[in-house]
Amino acid sequence: MKKGNLEANTKTVPFYKLFFFSDSTDVLLMIVGSIGAIANGVCSPLMTLLFGELIDAMGPNQNNEEIVERVSKVCLSLVYLGLGALGAAFLQVACWMITGERQAARIRSLYLKTILRQDIGFFDVEMTTGEVVGRMSGDTVLILDAMGEKVGKFIQLISTFVGGFVIAFLRGWLLTLVMLTSIPLLAMSGAAIAIIVTRASSQEQAAYAKASNVVEQTLGSIRTVASFTGEKQAMSSYKELINLAYKSNVKQGFVTGLGLGVMFLVFFSTYALGTWFGGEMILRKGYTGGAVINVMVTVVSSSIALGQASPCLTAFTAGKAAAYKMFETIEREPLIDTFDLNGKVLEDIRGEIELRDVCFSYPARPKEEVFGGFSLLIPSGTTTALVGESGSGKSTVISLIERFYDPNSGQVLIDGVDLKEFQLKWIRGKIGLVSQEPVLFSSSIMENIGYGKEGATVEEIQAASKLANAAKFIDKLPLGLETLVGEHGTQLSGGQKQRIAIARAILKDPRILLLDEATSALDAESERVVQEALDRIMVNRTTVIVAHRLSTVRNADIIAVIHRGKIVEEGSHSELLKDHEGAYSQLLRLQEINKESKRLEISDGSISSGSSRGNNSTRQDDDSFSVLGLLAGQDSTKMSQELSQKVSFTRIAALNKPEIPILILGTLVGAVNGTIFPIFGILFAKVIEAFFKAPHELKRDSRFWSMIFVLLGVAAVIVYPTTNYLFAIAGGRLIRRIRSMCFEKVVHMEVGWFDEPGNSSGAMGARLSADAALIRTLVGDSLCLSVKNVASLVTGLIIAFTASWEVAIIILVIIPFIGINGYIQIKFMKGFSADAKAKYEEASQVANDAVGSIRTVASFCAEEKVMEMYKKRCEDTIKSGIKQGLISGVGFGISFFVLYSVYASCFYVGARLVKAGRTNFNDVFQVFLALTLTAVGISQASSFAPDSSKGKGAAVSIFRIIDRISKIDSRDESGMVLENVKGDIELCHISFTYQTRPDVQVFRDLCLSIRAGQTVALVGESGSGKSTVISLLQRFYDPDSGHITLDGVELKKLRLKWLRQQMGLVGQEPVLFNDTIRANIAYGKGGEEATEAEIIAASELANAHRFISSIQKGYDTVVGERGIQLSGGQKQRVAIARAIVKEPKILLLDEATSALDAESERVVQDALDRVMVNRTTIVVAHRLSTIKNADVIAVVKNGVIAEKGTHETLINIEGGVYASLVQLHINASN
């Protein structure tokens, strides 16, 4: 990660812009809240005014009868002031919290809406799914923090500042002027800190955003990671990024501490100045002691208010930095805007499509031209098939017709009108897309089909699923249409997903139908029926088909052969066949390896299907079936409530063990830190006493105490940064340790764990980023705080009891109220911003899904539907935010009232004791100041400390991950390693169900033996469990009963990492990481370095070297998120090279060539044939040509192996399963 781009992220938006999205209600709330905040702020300087009066009342009238009466009046005024503060504080907090919650929710949904309306190029180049989710969960919390009650608090503090100075000027303008000189220093130190903190926090944010991208990529393709034992690599790149964040964190801590230290130096020097000059004023200008104290306290407390505004400023700056990226996106005008309602809307379209002189290159690779002057005419109502090599630009044609991209030059026309002139939403509504890797959303089957049409009825949805031949398998599911499909549709097999995608397109009833390899993942039976369904809906529609299986395209009216971005031939099947040397004939010849395979060719989904749920889950396994999902959901909240009491402090502290020396040092410095305020209390009492002494003593004492004040300030400058720095190191290291522990734990969980709804990549990413940071508040920060507070308390009590034990005891009885009040205020001050975490996890999953499958969202114009789902999931959050605002407001208001009443009682009691001659007024002040300043010190220290209540919940969720023992842990070093692997595999009496679907038995008593060096093909219908065999062999899951052996040793007894290294997996939807091609191939080595020679050898074997070398950056080309920058065939070849680099003893090919065109398939098949030599190979496939040459063909049906033998044997079994599957194909192709 380059430093450069971290630096760039420190831009911010102007503050007013945060409120850009408020409505009239918000404006009203903000006005009322601000009035409340101003009133509340002025209460504090008014209190100092009353304090001055008290001093004058008690000072000179030592033995006067009037003392109690004068003091009583002042005390009563204090109580009234408290009542006023109560109302003002309530308005301040409640209004600002409510409006903040409302506006943040609005920003969040606007951001998602903007993301959804961006053109596809934006996602190729600028934005990744992880980043969107990170910004929506992390950055909006920072924004909310900057525009909610922190603004109210800020206004309150500023009005304290202004009000204070007005009062100070009225009471003694000269002294005030002199003391004012310290304010610029204060402001400057505050400003400098805000700037540096912003920079550090922006860098930290950027590093974390990249780290959460690593999490999203790794967990989103956990099967690939596990299969290639890539856990270590993921860990090391994650650690590198969190280390960067740690460094920013420490820097931030030190700077904040330095800022506080400098501020306190300025405060205490201001008191020093006031004491010295105030003494002079009493002597020369006849000021009263009360007036001098009033001015001093007012000036300083007003300045303190300014200092207390610094955390608000920090929050504002962090919020402005977070908003910059989000607002930049919100304001980005997409090149192709779905929400733009301008443009033509016709009665209807005929559906004639023309590409005229199109030049085009993908935004992510602008220098590589895909088309240079490409032209193609598709008459309305006809079916045109595009054929050609992988990467020749067939799917690009479809992207251009859908207007995912605009051509660089040339035009795409429909009915002679340029696509750009149509209203985008309307024209996309006329186009139906079914693509090669169908994308489903984490919701029910019904909702997924419903994306095809706004407000579709259940009947329409059922009819569409019948047409797509999906009704049968849906009815078999326990919940039917209400079944949840999981993240990226992982709960369904490839064939099932594809049929739902087709039903979704059918429901749309489009004029133009785009089929991008639409039947490539289906088994023979489904394919025949789906093909019929497609044939039925293709009537009278313009259809564009991209297919590799040439048999699917024979009936097309026009076949266009594309080669390197040019049409080299065009015509019908029979016309093109006449030219024996033509490109089409050559492609066909490649596929006609022999007559039979040719006849069966149509079986794109030939003898088997897109596998049971195993391979597609290379995607990511998430939600389970809906009922279970709901149960699991309830269970986990219950669990978290039960557990939240159970995580002991010692347990968390143990994690900080390595930092004990730092913590001890920090604690000692922190203790010194804690004594500063109580000592300040004594000094202050001494100054009050000095002001009522004889002139010569007054002169001497005021000078002496001034010097002491300055020394106290110097101590603060040393102590604050040191404490903060030490605790930042300890806290930062703890966060870093927890993050890497958790991530390590999660990466090594068994694959089945990710099938649970709460463990989706989105949710885990959010947890790793938010929770780890919160735990820090429980250890370092809270230790630091406790030490400061204990030191303050002890010092305060010693001072108070030495002065006057009677007053001390009475004040002590009352002081807990100040403590409680301080605690409540801080609790509210910190805990206001609603705990957004859990509520947003669900909502971020919606966002995660939509952004991850943005093409599907765009092609079905489902943006508004996604927004609705998102808003629905956010409703409760806003409601609870409002509720919290009201409760916090009441609490905050009451706390002020209590504070003022307590002050009043203290002085009333003190006055009575002075009158009774039990004590003198100096001691009353000393006790009062020592104790109240201790309380102030404690609450002030606490107000700077982050809130630990959320930390407890976070600790529970973190420890739940750390404590969970992975059922199948690849770190486990125990287990045998075989010297020499032959490759005999035996599955004995296997029964198996997926945990998330315990009522669907996948295998019951399945037996299969595979001899070393044999190639075994698994065939069977879609969903019969073929891919599950592959998942079991890699120990993604363990069977419920029975056992699997390798060379006679049970898999569970072998070392897991070693076992996975013996197997090379190539799946149907290859998962590549957002990294270079080189890194993706080298990934096969499982964390060991792969040499350049090995990488090139592997890609040559996989027939990838040629296409890689032809790309501009060659092996250094970045493949994009989920490999989006490469075509299906190119991705697959990179995936095969990755498996080959591993030099595995056992090859697992799960539909490995289903996404390739004839030419690549032949070469890849050759490559696979070469690599298969002397290796045990298990093939899941539906193409007969692939299956026919297998040594053994095993037919999976109803959870058992129904038949096994060679092609010749099985084909001759009368009425056998295999024979009838083959027969099906022959009929299908004829």
Swiss-Prot record:
Keywords: ATP-binding, Glycoprotein, Membrane, Nucleotide-binding, Repeat, Transmembrane, Transmembrane helix, Transport. GO terms for cellular component: cytosol; membrane. GO terms for molecular function: ABC-type transporter activity; ATP binding; ATP hydrolysis activity. The keyword Cell membrane does not apply. Its main location: membrane. Residues 602-621 are annotated as: Disordered. It is found in: Membrane. Residues 30-318, 663-950 form the ABC transmembrane type-1 domain. Disulfide bonds: none annotated. Residues 353-589, 985-1223 form the ABC transporter domain. Glycans are attached at N540, N615, N616, N759, N1074, N1174, N1227. InterPro entries: AAA+_ATPase, ABC1_TM_dom, ABC1_TM_sf, ABC_transporter-like_ATP-bd, ABC_transporter-like_CS, P-loop_NTPase, Type_1_exporter. Belongs to the ABC transporter superfamily. ABCB family. Multidrug resistance exporter (TC 3.A.1.201) subfamily. This is ABC transporter B family member 5. The lineage of its organism: Eukaryota, Viridiplantae, Streptophyta, Embryophyta, Tracheophyta. The gene is ABCB5.
